[in-house]
Amino acid sequence: MPFLMELFGKVESWHEKLYLHLSKPFFRRAFYLTKKIFIYNEIVLFFFQKNMISKNMTVGEIVAKNVAFAEIFEKYGIDFCCGGDVSFIEICEKNNLDAEKIIAELQNLPEKQSADHDFENFDLGDLADYIVDVHHTFVRENIPRIDEYLNKICRVHGENHPELFGVLENYEAVREELLAHMPKEENVLFPYIHRLVDAEKNNIAPAKPPFGTVKNPIRMMEMEHDNAGDATKNIRNLTNNFTLPEDACNSYRITFELLENFEKDLHVHIHLENNILFPKAIALEEKLWNA
């Protein structure tokens, strides 16, 4: 007690004593430093937990933690969109990949995903809007350019590289699939997902849609995703992973760049729907109907 008397002095209450004590410059600095250390540790723990990966997780679940992981999976040819429901270890064993090496690469990848793009925690309505604004827009903007360049190199180089006609056939298949697919999402499925979100916010049960349950259009969308995914795989195989031949001109190079970027965008597009938006929409509908 004599120490406390010496430390605090003679003041009326312990609140005043503590305030005066912490007001001293030394203790203010110590308190501020302790607070910074605590916040830093919380941030480190958040990113450690966010990027914790188990071999038994599905590849879709892994990319859902951080969409930046997609570029590592792309490098190893791991299908995380249409094949996102397969476990990571199963894919590694099937394709003779070093699981430990890939996990190390994933965990050492710089955090590229800002809070604005933490898709796993997006509001479902906002995620649907994001898919339309970013990925549907990307498809519609790039189709005319790919049409122009791909048809051009088929005319100029098709005789020496007949595989280009197979590329064109598969590209036209995925193009038509997407041009029919996107309006179904924009006009039927996504508006219903918005209604589910609004119903949850207002604590009411949503009216049953004419298609019965959200599972029905989702099942159709996933089948169409599979078709588009198969066509892009065929394109990658026909082009030997977009490898340019020795006689490739600038138009050839631009075409392959456009096709590869189209494929990468489609992979993320399908991942956001198959592995995040669709499962959560199904769970939300079931929760609201069973409430």
Protein language model annotation of sequence segments:
Residues 1-10:
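Extreme N-terminal basic, low-complexity initiation segments
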Residues 4, 20-22, 27-28, 32-33:
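Short hydrophobic targeting helices and cationic amphipathic motifs
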Residues 10, 31-33, 38:
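Juxtamembrane/membrane-water interface recognition
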Residues 10, 24-25, 221, 232:
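General helical secondary-structure elements
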Residues 17, 35-37, 43, 50:
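Polybasic, lysine-rich low-complexity intrinsically disordered segments
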Residues 44-291:
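Small-residue-biased structural context
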